[in-house]
Amino acid sequence: MTIPPATMHRAAPLDACPKNMTYGPCGGVNPDGSCEAHPDPCVFLQRDLPVRWPDAATTPVPAPTAAATEVADILARRALVMTGFPARPMVADDVSRVAEVLAPHTDAALSGDAATSRTQFPPSYRGHLMTAAGMRAWIGVNARDRNRVALEGELAALRDAGVAGVHCVTGDHTETGDRPDAAPVFDLEATTLLPRARAHGLLPSFAESPAAPPHRRRRLRDHSREGRAP
């Protein structure tokens, strides 16, 4: 989405990513190469920013949740049937009603972390409600709204809730959404959130925007590298 210039902060020329990303660019680069949150070009398109990959983590990965094991077993046999979870963001009673309709026809359901920065129940509570309603829950978690301590707490709570997987996204900048008054965090990004989800025994997934510049496979490669089992 291209942001009208009037809604952007008139900052100094861009010399660092507004999302504090290391493994950029994100999927929000506009078709003309400009940053989603700044009129200047994305810094990852202007120059190579070499990234040193850390050594593979040696921390033992705990056993997956029961729902994650079930999803892995399904994937070993056939294609997974997954759908979105169209419940209102702050209405707990919607969850059981939607689950009653979807559960007989789908293997899992994705409840995303709002890209538009609207207020909604936190990921772990959504995961708890969906699991209690009989759904295999795949829960979106963005790095925009929480620092790494809060994110690690959410992942621990998601494991405790028994969700199947975590959809890890960096998140759209708050300048582009419904709450431009909210300060973005971006202490982590999708690429650094993925291994943390995996380390909690959760199946991780990520989003990719193939139409966003620079039209290369680097984002896909980097996300896959961090999300797969060692």
List PLM regions with ranges.
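Generic signal for short, ordered secondary-structure residues
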Residues: 4-5, 81, 109, 130, ...
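Structural motif corresponding to the early beta-alpha repeats
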Residues: 131, 135-151, 157
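Alpha-helix-loop-beta-strand connector modules within alpha/beta enzyme cores
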Residues: 117-140, 184-206
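Metallocofactor- and cofactor-centric catalytic cores in central/energy metabolism, strongly enriched
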Residues: 1-73, 78-92, 112, 117-123
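Alpha/beta enzyme core
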Residues: 68-82, 90-108, 148, 152-230
